[in-house]
Amino acid sequence: MKVIKVENQVQGGKVAFEILKEKLANGAQTLGLATGSSPLEFYKEIVESDLDFSNLTSVNLDEYVGLDGDNPQSYRYFMQENLFNQKPFKESFLPRGVKDNAEAEVERYNQILADHPVDLQILGIGRNGHIGFNEPGTPFDSQTHLVELDQSTIEANARFFAKIEDVPTQAISMGIKNILDAKSIILFAYGESKAEAIAGTVSGPVTENLPASSLQNHPDVTIIADAEALSLLEK
């Protein structure tokens, strides 16, 4: 596991983009993508580059259950606004946030992941150490599944909604096994609120109580983080 300290998210996006260019030069075809504020500067680097992504495939980590793709709070909408509209991919897959028959959607998405092995997976991290929407207690051998969101996750995401009651309580998420199947992983972490989770991810015990600690079992993980997120690790 490699840890790169950056001044801010802008620098973090540039560092990640250099890693991406190296992976693409070595034949990467499929990118695993994440939402949230952490990867935004990385996506900006992609959009502003002259690289052609029209032969690449993307698969996203997760999607809320109950939000249509046209809903501004859906992750499909987020990806369209921040990346896909400006930099089209050959194919872009996201879980469908269907309320009915979620089991069929889980099966469909696991097949997509089997058909499109991820070369580089992008991650953020939750305050409780979740990656994707894999909350504490998620088995490390889990594949795509329906998730009941932790209250801390709902509270953290409430800032994106008019009121906390509007935040979906369920999501469909890649499982930890799906994430670890990626050849390479970049995890972004910014701010003091992520410090405890990062300390456990890098140097704590590998435990299902901290989903991101599973990354210690992966051979090629790069953590890009600022001083605040690394503050407990450096003490």
UniProtKB/Swiss-Prot annotation:
Top-rank EC class of the record's enzyme: hydrolase
Xref: InterPro entries: Glc/Gal-6P_isomerase, Glucosamine6P_isomerase, Glucosamine6P_isomerase_CS, NagB/RpiA_transferase-like
Residue ranges that the Swiss-Prot or TrEMBL entry lists as coiled coil: none
Pathway membership, UniProt: Amino-sugar metabolism; N-acetylneuraminate degradation; D-fructose 6-phosphate from N-acetylneuraminate: step 5/5
Origin superkingdom: Bacteria
UniProt keyword 4Fe-4S, yes or no: no
Catalytic activity reported: alpha-D-glucosamine 6-phosphate + H2O = beta-D-fructose 6-phosphate + NH4(+)
E.C. designation(s): 3.5.99.6
Any Pfam family matching the protein: Glucosamine_iso
Cellular compartments per GO CC: cytoplasm
GO biological processes: carbohydrate metabolic process; glucosamine catabolic process; N-acetylglucosamine catabolic process; N-acetylneuraminate catabolic process
Active site: 62 (proton acceptor), 128 (for ring-opening step), 130 (proton acceptor), 135 (for ring-opening step)
Molecular function per GO: glucosamine-6-phosphate deaminase activity; identical protein binding
Keyword Hydrolase annotated: yes
Keywords: Carbohydrate metabolism, Hydrolase
HAMAP family noted in UniProt: GlcN6P_deamin
Function of the protein: Catalyzes the reversible isomerization-deamination of glucosamine 6-phosphate (GlcN6P) to form fructose 6-phosphate (Fru6P) and ammonium ion.
PANTHER family found in the cross-reference section: GLUCOSAMINE-6-PHOSPHATE ISOMERASE
Family from the record: Belongs to the glucosamine/galactosamine-6-phosphate isomerase family. NagB subfamily.
UniProt-recorded name of the protein: Glucosamine-6-phosphate deaminase
Organism: Streptococcus pneumoniae (strain Hungary19A-6)
Top-level taxonomy: Bacteria, Bacillati, Bacillota, Bacilli, Lactobacillales
